[in-house]
Regions:
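Cys/His-rich zinc-coordinating "finger" modules and their low-complexity flanking regions
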Residues: 1-478
C-alpha cells in the first residue's frame, strides 16, 4: 500500500469508517480501492472476533471483495469500504462496524425502547418507523421491547436524529416528571404555572382577534374553548395550550424537550419553522444543545394529516437532507412528505392556520395553493397590491368575494410576536413591537419598503423595521 496525501475515490478508512480530510495521509491500495488512515494502519486487524451476544460462533475476517449483504444491517458494501467478517460454520456475514451495535436503544419516534432482533424468516414483515419502507425479514431489525407492532431498520434506528446509539441493556428507564402545568381548582377554574398571580376560568367559544394565546401566540377566532384570567389582565390560553405536557419527545430529536413558559423580555427562533416567537417553547435541557420548538411545531407527530393533502404525511428523509416544499418552494431539512405520491410540506406551511379573518371581508379566508396554475390566471394581493403566484407560494383566499392575500401580508413576517412586546436583544438593545395602524406606513430602514404588516419594530434609537429579520440584517450590516 502506498502512503498518499491526495484525493482518491475512497477517502474513507475501511477500518474505522472515518472520512480522511484532504490534507491527511492515508494508506491506499490502487488495485482494490482499500484505504486505511494512519492511526488504523498501526493497529493489527483482528482476524478473529468472538462476540456471543451477536453470533454464537467465532467470526473470521473475510479478506475478499464481496457484494454480500450484512446480516445485521442488510446493506451491501458496493464500494468495498467496510471490513467484512463471516462465520465458517453458518451462512452469516457481518460488517465489522455492526458487530458491536447496541442491543437496546432509546429512539425519538417511539415511546418505548427498542431491542435488536436477528433475522426471522417466519416473522411477518413490518414497515420501518423511520423510512416507512418494508423491513426485510432476512436481516436484523430493532423492535419494541413492550410488544408493540413497531420496528426499524438497523441502519435507520441508529441515525443521529433517531438514537444516540447508547447501549441501554440492563439500564433503568429514565423517569421524567410529566405532571400537569396547572392545578385544577374545580368548576372550570385552574391555576396555571405560567400565570401564578391569578386564577383562570374556562370560557366557551371565545372570540377576540385582537388578543393572542400566550402559548402559541395565535389570535382567538372563536373556534374553541379558552382559559381566561379572572382578573383584569389579558392573559388567555387556548384550552389545548393549557393542557400542554411538561415533557415532550419530538420525533426529530433524541433528547426529551421541556416546556419553557413565555418569553416576556426576549424571543426565540423555532428550530423547524424558523419563525420568531415570544410564546411557550419546548427546549432541550442538555447543555450545549440548542433545540427550541414553538408549541405548534412541537405538536406535529406522525402520521400527520393536513387539510391540503389527502394522504397522511411522514418524515422519511434523513438528517441534513433538504427537499423543497410543494407550497412555498422553500428547501427545509427533513420536511413532512407523502410516501404514496411524493408531496412535500415544510413545517412553516404545516403550522399555518387553516382559516383566518381579514378586516375588509365578512367571510373567513382559507389557506390554499395551486400545484399547477394557468399562465393566464392572475392573482392580486389586496394589501401590498402585488401579484401572487399560487404555484410558488401559498395564499389566503375568499372564494365568495374573490379576495386573495399573501400569507405574510395577512399574518405578518412575525406572526408569533405580539404588539406591545418589548424584547431585549443579545446586544442589550431594547426593541419595541408596536401596532402599525397609521394611515401613513413607515419605511423600513433595511428593505426600504413601506411596512405592510400589522406590527412594526422600533428601536431605542428610533429606527423602524418591518420585521425581526430586517432588524437582524441591519445589525449584520453594521
Amino acid at each position: 500500500m502506498d502512503p498518499l496525501n491526495q484525493q482518491y475515490p475512497n477517502s474513507r478508512c475501511c477500518s474505522c469508517q472515518g472520512y480522511c480530510p484532504f490534507s491527511c495521509l492515508l494508506y491506499y491500495c490502487l488495485v482494490c480501492d482499500f484505504a486505511l488512515d494512519v492511526i488504523c494502519s498501526r493497529k493489527p486487524i483482528s482476524l478473529k472476533i468472538y462476540n456471543p451476544k451477536r453470533h454464537k460462533h467465532t467470526l473470521h475476517y473475510f479478506p475478499r471483495k464481496s457484494t454480500l449483504a450484512c446480516d445485521v444491517c442488510g446493506l451491501v458494501d458496493d464500494d468495498y469500504s467496510h471490513l467484512l467478517y463471516t462465520c465458517l460454520l453458518c451462512d452469516f456475514f457481518i460488517h465489522k462496524r455492526c458487530i458491536d451495535l447496541p442491543y437496546v436503544i432509546k429512539v425519538s419516534r417511539h415511546n418505548h425502547r427498542l431491542a435488536f432482533t436477528p433475522s426471522n424468516p417466519f416473522k411477518e414483515s413490518a414497515d420501518c418507523g423511520v423510512c416507512y419502507r418494508k423491513i426485510d425479514i432476512n436481516f436484523g431489525e430493532y423492535s419494541c421491547v413492550k410488544g408493540c407492532v413497531y420496528a426499524m431498520h438497523s441502519r435507520c434506528a441508529l441515525q443521529s436524529d433517531v438514537s444516540d446509539g447508547k447501549e441501554l441493556e440492563g439500564e433503568p428507564e429514565e423517569a421524567y416528571k410529566n405532571t400537569k402545568m396547572f392545578e385544577d381548582k374545580g368548576d372550570g377554574v385552574i391555576l396555571h404555572e405560567s400565570h401564578l398571580c391569578h386564577l383562570m376560568k374556562l370560557e366557551n367559544q371565545f372570540h377576540d382577534e385582537n388578543k393572542h394565546c400566550q402559548a402559541c401566540m395565535l389570535p382567538f377566532y372563536g373556534d374553541g374553548n379558552v382559559y381566561r384570567c379572572m382578573q383584569s389582565c389579558d392573559f388567555i390560553l387556548h384550552e389545548s395550550c393549557a393542557y400542554l405536557p411538561r415533557v415532550k419527545q419530538f420525533m426529530l430529536h433524541v433528547h426529551p424537550l421541556i416546556l419553557e413558559l413565555g418569553y416576556t423580555t426576549s424571543c426565540f427562533r423555532c428550530r423547524k419553522c424558523e419563525r420568531y416567537s415570544c410564546g411557550f417553547a419546548y427546549v432541550c435541557p442538555i447543555e450545549g444543545c440548542d433545540w427550541k420548538l414553538d408549541t405548534l411545531c412541537a405538536s406535529i407527530c406522525e402520521p400527520f394529516n393536513h387539510y391540503s393533502h389527502p394522504h397522511p404525511l411522514f418524515i422519511t428523509c434523513g438528517e441534513y437532507t433538504s427537499i423543497p416544499c410543494y407550497i412555498c418552494r422553500y428547501r427545509q431539512e427533513q420536511p413532512l412528505d407523502c410516501v404514496e405520491c411524493g408531496f412535500v410540506l415544510c413545517f412553516s406551511c404545516a403550522t399555518l392556520p387553516h382559516k383566518l379573518r381579514y378586516k375588509h371581508d365578512e367571510h373567513l379566508l382559507v389557506f390554499s395553493y395551486k400545484e399547477y396554475a394557468d399562465d393566464d390566471e392572475l392573482y392580486w394581493c389586496e394589501i401590498c397590491e402585488k401579484d401572487i403566484f399560487p404555484h410558488e407560494e401559498g395564499l389566503y383566499a375568499c372564494n365568495e368575494c374573490e379576495v386573495t392575500l399573501h400569507v405574510d401580508c395577512l399574518l405578518g413576517r412575525d406572526p408569533y410576536m405580539k404588539s406591545g412586546q418589548t424584547v431585549v436583544t443579545f446586544g442589550k438593545e431594547k426593541i419595541h413591537y408596536l401596532p402599525n395602524t397609521h394611515l401613513t406606513r413607515p419605511i423600513c430602514k433595511t428593505c426600504g419598503r413601506h411596512c405592510p404588516y400589522k406590527i412594526k419594530i422600533k428601536t431605542s434609537s428610533g429606527d423602524l423595521f418591518c420585521s425581526y429579520a430586517c432588524y437582524q440584517e441591519h445589525l449584520y450590516n453594521l
